[in-house]
Swiss-Prot record:
Upper taxonomic lineage: Eukaryota, Metazoa, Chordata, Craniata, Vertebrata
Disordered: annotated span: 195-219
Matching InterPro entries: TMEM179B (IPR029776)
UniProt source species: Danio rerio
Transmembrane segments: 6-26, 69-89, 105-125, 167-187
Major place of residence: membrane
Keywords of the record: Membrane, Transmembrane, Transmembrane helix
Membrane topology value: Multi-pass membrane protein
Protein name (record): Transmembrane protein 179B
Subcellular location: Membrane
Top-level taxonomic group: Eukaryota
């Protein structure tokens, strides 16, 4: 059974949000691993001879929070996509009740809030780390140039800026997609409430609205 266009577009957005969530979680986790398990958001560095060393770092729960939010959004999007595919190709009846659209809107608001918080954490946390690098390490004018510098073993910071930037970009793209999802659900909810039980559908042909038995003629 063919899916309605608004729902089809909504499912495509869910798939895109799933990919964004996986990118964010993977980028933050790999970046954390390259710093020997430390969460370098809001972190600072120092020079130890000619190598860069970690001076301070954030609580591990901060990076875990960012990854957990991204994974939760990805799992929800994946599950919802599978559900509607099952309904379309197995059940064959596409029906969205107003109650569940309200639930979707509520969850969308929750996800938008946490994605906004996550994006701000990644943005400000990365900027704090970059400010420390620019003030500590000489001969660099951009944060990404520190990727090519020598770091104290076992730190492997060759792609730290690229990974953190990818994580932040994926979060903001995810946030934008969820705003579109909210608009699509609101449109479908409004269209669903236009025709209420007990009212005639103006687009229905006259034969569908006439009584089953003809009324007797007037005397």
């Amino acid at each position: 059974m063919a899916l309605p266009r608004p729902l089809l577009l909504e499912l495509l957005l869910y798939g895109s949000c799933f990919i964004c969530g996986i990118i964010t979680a993977a980028s933050v986790t790999i970046s954390q691993g390259s710093f020997d398990g430390k969460c370098m958001l809001y972190g600072s560095v120092r020079l130890n001879s000619s190598t860069i060393d970690v001076l301070s770092f954030s609580s591990l729960s901060l990076c875990y929070f960012v990854s957990a939010i991204s994974v939760c959004v990805a799992v929800f999007c994946f599950s919802l996509t599978l559900y509607w595919i099952y309904i379309a190709f197995v059940d064959g009846e596409i029906k969205r009740e107003k109650l569940w659209m309200n639930v979707t809107l509520g969850l969308s608001g929750v996800f938008l809030f946490f994605l906004l918080v996550t994006g701000c954490i990644l943005k400000i946390g990365r900027d704090r780390l970059c400010d420390s690098l620019l003030h500590t390490v000489s001969n660099i004018t951009r944060c990404e140039e520190a990727q090519n510098k020598s770091w104290r073993s076992p730190i492997n910071a060759s792609q730290f800026y690229t990974r953190l930037h990818s994580a932040e970009t994926a979060v903001w793209v995810n946030f934008f997609f969820w705003m579109i999802i909210v608009v699509l659900v609101l449109i479908q909810r409004h269209k669903g409430s236009e025709i209420r039980p007990g009212t005639e559908d103006p687009s229905a042909p006259p034969s569908e609205t006439e009584p089953f038995f003809n009324r007797p003629g007037r005397p």
